[in-house]
Amino acid sequence: MDKYALLQRAKLHLDFIHANSTTHSFLFGALAELLDNARDAGAVRLDVFSVDNETLQGGFMLCFLDDGCGMSPDEASDVIYFGTSKKRLSTLKFIGQYGNGLKSGSMRIGKDCILFTKKEETMTCLFFSQTFCEKEGLTEVVVPIPSWLTRTRESITDDPQKFFTELSIIFKYSPFKTEAELMQQFDMIYGRCGTLLIIYNLKLLLSGEPELDVTTDKEDILMAEAPEEIPERRSFRAYTAVLYFEPRMKIFIQAKRVQTKHLCYSLYKPRKYQYTTSSFKGKFKTEVQKAEEAVKRAELLFKEVQAKVNQPDRIALSSTQDALQKALQDVDTKHKSLRQKQRALRKARTLSLFFGVNTEDQHQAGMFIYSNNRLIKMYEKVGPQLKMKSLLGAGIIGIVNIPLETMEPSHNKQEFLNVQEYNHLLKVMGQYLIQYCKDIGISNRNLTLFWDEFKYQHSKDTDSSLESLQWRRRQAMGIPFILQCDLCLKWRVLPSSSNYQEKGLPDLWICASNPNNLENSCNQIERLPSIPLGTVNRRPPSKDERERQLQESVQRYQDKLVEAQPQKSQLIVTSKIPEFKSSCLSSALKEKSKLGRIQPSGADLTQGSPSSVKLSFMQRSQKRSTEDTHSDVEFICMTKIPKKSVKKTVKYLQPGHAPALLENLKLEDTAQVSSREIKKQQSESLVQAGKASTDVASSRDPTVTMVWDQSSTKVSLKQEEEEEVPLIKPDKQELCDDTPVVKGNSSALHWKSLPGVQMEDLSPRSGHKINSVSGDCQLPASPMPSQSMSVEETARKLLSNLREILLYFVPEFQLSSEFECTSVEELITNPELERCPENINEKLKTCFNQIQNIYMAQYEKRLKRKMQSIVYEANRRGLLNQVFLGQCELKRKRTEEKLSDLRAKLALLLQKLQLGGPAGDPQQIDAYLEDLLKEDRLPTALHEKSPESA
């Protein structure tokens, strides 16, 4: 680094102290930074209290005292550096990561602070003062750090002059004017280790009052001029109660214990949802980039060393070979680390989302976002809570604890660095909020009834007689009452029969005070209530959504038609349609038969009286195989006709026309014609058929009929037609018939697609003439709309199976770049997959090919390795069991030998005591001893034997 000795270096200016503190827009967030330091230090107890001192700005000092691990003089010296922290390198999950919380948090509250810490046999004082630097005219930050020995109270210094200067600065600019007063502050740390932080010269409001109010409530620290709607934004006691996801530290504010909340178990009807995603990759991407840079540096270093070794004029030394070997090992290590980080990047992660109802106040609702057990955001509105007039989601609290590696918080721990990922999380939680409301049965209809049960919570004139009622209702609702032990810090569930609510919660509570005998000892494990899992069912689309999807599908299809052939729709004025000759109509039929379609001919649509319109239906012979039964539907849009002049009858083909028609139908329908010619011929023939299909005598005004050709095989018009029919109301308007022309023997006339034809008009009793159809032409049963529903259900199941397959494979394997999706979440949640599957058929084919050729092959290899490891482990355990069995057998034999020797010695003893000698059989010896003990002869014999021996 000597080559950079002459270069300029950045310096920390005094003004940065104030600028750094302004990152805390929320004042309690600055206080929380100091609580985080105590928690990271392993403190069991933390006291936050104020000490009055009228000589100081603000009128009091704010003190933080904990019993954590404390700091040595060297560790205290590291505190003054900005942006460095050993916590980041630790394997433990510390809240602090940036090395900035103490400086930014304390300087946000006041201008000066002094820190006293004890660790092992040393005591250290750290004086961090803006007032001192400003009055001395310093532009840099100067921090005195004197130290003493704990037992002798002697200074730890190699330079007495430096120690004297540090003390003189502290005596002049701190509230403590002598060394004895400094020692008194060390004595406040009641253990062998701990830390005391004192902040003074507090910052003021424009009114001249301090930002923190310690006079209004003697047992709390309030934020001055803060709104009172949300207690956590005004009361520091209420804020610290929910500050940590899993509270493991006793907090005392103004000498009174804070009743911390395990928020997940303090709500009504809690539910837990498992959200699996691979979208949150912010920090993992950074780690992969760092690992890639490390690999590049290691490879570059290896090449440099290798180049030195391979020089022809250089003698190979052992040191050079060792350096080359170390460089190679470093490259392998860096590659291994890179592969691990890449696997971590691809791995899907599961977040536990908790939801419950806050019955105390329905206006206190929103999401609590924790990061590494520390509260970052609270009461974040999501989903229906964002709507001003919506009551759905009122009073519902959502909770999520995000690991540090999944989503990284900002330096002030009040925001998240990746705003896009955070907004995505809020969107997901809004979706789960709606699902939670469904799971517990809350909807817009019964919200009023639901909250009427908790009106007693909002009554301001509640008397004491209702307090017990509140408690009983709270227990009846199933909200568990849990307390934290002051010794082991475990949470215990109290039975409903306990009367702590009526007497008030004690400041000191231990497990031995628990009425539950199963959890009245600190040695017993912590048993928290189980939170039921919520259900995430795929909800069926509503009627409005189905209509919207249908309209979008029709619009997409029409856009395709316009792109393929702009002149696709024609307006036909029926009053100006001339009559066609039979030859023209037969030629039109011949063209349609070549294309494989059947349309009504104008010759069969004969003119009748003005009060009747004759319809003709034709059906192909059942000579086609089932492979060619795909039906294409062509229809004429319904035309509005006056009700008085319209009367419908049904008449089939006349026998004279049937043979000619059947001959035309026998033509080969698979001729290869270009798509444009097919569409043109279809359009012309359809227009001709439409011109001959309508003739209304009594209608003077011209009637406009719009003809559409829907011959695309990508969109199932049969489903769209069946979904559109129920939307037409026959009682409001009279419409002409939809005339579907169907090819193939699997299709038939949709009676429900003829809203103008009454079913009784088609019966023989109605007076209409119905002729039979000769040959194989018959009228099959009408397919029901359930067919389209079954198709939709089948498609839904297929998509569901595809999602399951992708979610199974993709977390471990790469997603192909052909999908144009960065993650599997974007692919499986793509709405185009459901609304327009025809546009991504190629992608689906690629997906299935990749699953079959790549994923399954890799899966089989992994499964084979896993089975081999299982077989190896089973064989190894079998050998171990055999060895263990042999050892047990040897022990058994030794035990039997010892037992036989003992029985023999016992038989000799009984003979000496003249109590008889049992036989050598072990069972007989045991039986003889039992009889001897029952007769009480043994004590008597021993008593008689003792005088004789004496």
Curated annotation (Swiss-Prot):
<feature type="compositionally biased region" description="Basic and acidic residues">
    <location>
        <begin position="541"/>
        <end position="550"/>
    </location>
</feature>
<dbReference type="GO" id="GO:0005634">
    <property type="term" value="C:nucleus"/>
</dbReference>
<keyword id="KW-0863">Zinc-finger</keyword>
<dbReference type="GO" id="GO:0007283">
    <property type="term" value="P:spermatogenesis"/>
</dbReference>
<feature type="binding site">
    <location>
        <position position="522"/>
    </location>
    <ligand>
        <name>Zn(2+)</name>
    </ligand>
</feature>
<protein>
    <recommendedName>
        <fullName>MORC family CW-type zinc finger protein 1</fullName>
    </recommendedName>
</protein>
<dbReference type="GO" id="GO:0141005">
    <property type="term" value="P:transposable element silencing by heterochromatin formation"/>
</dbReference>
<dbReference type="GO" id="GO:0032197">
    <property type="term" value="P:retrotransposition"/>
</dbReference>
<dbReference type="GO" id="GO:0044727">
    <property type="term" value="P:epigenetic programing of male pronucleus"/>
</dbReference>
<dbReference type="GO" id="GO:0031047">
    <property type="term" value="P:regulatory ncRNA-mediated gene silencing"/>
</dbReference>
<keyword id="KW-0862">Zinc</keyword>
<keyword id="KW-0479">Metal-binding</keyword>
<feature type="binding site">
    <location>
        <position position="485"/>
    </location>
    <ligand>
        <name>Zn(2+)</name>
    </ligand>
</feature>
<dbReference type="GO" id="GO:0001673">
    <property type="term" value="C:male germ cell nucleus"/>
</dbReference>
<keyword id="KW-0221">Differentiation</keyword>
<feature type="region of interest" description="Disordered">
    <location>
        <begin position="532"/>
        <end position="551"/>
    </location>
</feature>
<dbReference type="InterPro" id="IPR011124">
    <property type="entry name" value="Znf_CW"/>
</dbReference>
<dbReference type="GO" id="GO:0030154">
    <property type="term" value="P:cell differentiation"/>
</dbReference>
<feature type="coiled-coil region">
    <location>
        <begin position="281"/>
        <end position="342"/>
    </location>
</feature>
<feature type="zinc finger region" description="CW-type">
    <location>
        <begin position="465"/>
        <end position="530"/>
    </location>
</feature>
<keyword id="KW-0175">Coiled coil</keyword>
<comment type="function">
    <text>Required for spermatogenesis. Essential for de novo DNA methylation and silencing of transposable elements in the male embryonic germ cells. Not required for piRNA biosynthesis.</text>
</comment>
<dbReference type="InterPro" id="IPR041006">
    <property type="entry name" value="Morc_S5"/>
</dbReference>
<dbReference type="GO" id="GO:0008270">
    <property type="term" value="F:zinc ion binding"/>
</dbReference>
<feature type="binding site">
    <location>
        <position position="511"/>
    </location>
    <ligand>
        <name>Zn(2+)</name>
    </ligand>
</feature>
<dbReference type="GO" id="GO:0001662">
    <property type="term" value="P:behavioral fear response"/>
</dbReference>
<dbReference type="Pfam" id="PF17942">
    <property type="entry name" value="Morc6_S5"/>
</dbReference>
<dbReference type="Pfam" id="PF07496">
    <property type="entry name" value="zf-CW"/>
</dbReference>
<keyword id="KW-0217">Developmental protein</keyword>
<dbReference type="InterPro" id="IPR036890">
    <property type="entry name" value="HATPase_C_sf"/>
</dbReference>
<feature type="coiled-coil region">
    <location>
        <begin position="885"/>
        <end position="916"/>
    </location>
</feature>
<dbReference type="GO" id="GO:0040029">
    <property type="term" value="P:epigenetic regulation of gene expression"/>
</dbReference>
<dbReference type="Pfam" id="PF13589">
    <property type="entry name" value="HATPase_c_3"/>
</dbReference>
<keyword id="KW-0744">Spermatogenesis</keyword>
<dbReference type="GO" id="GO:2000143">
    <property type="term" value="P:negative regulation of DNA-templated transcription initiation"/>
</dbReference>
<dbReference type="GO" id="GO:0010629">
    <property type="term" value="P:negative regulation of gene expression"/>
</dbReference>
<feature type="binding site">
    <location>
        <position position="488"/>
    </location>
    <ligand>
        <name>Zn(2+)</name>
    </ligand>
</feature>
<feature type="region of interest" description="Disordered">
    <location>
        <begin position="679"/>
        <end position="700"/>
    </location>
</feature>
<keyword id="KW-0943">RNA-mediated gene silencing</keyword>
<keyword id="KW-0539">Nucleus</keyword>
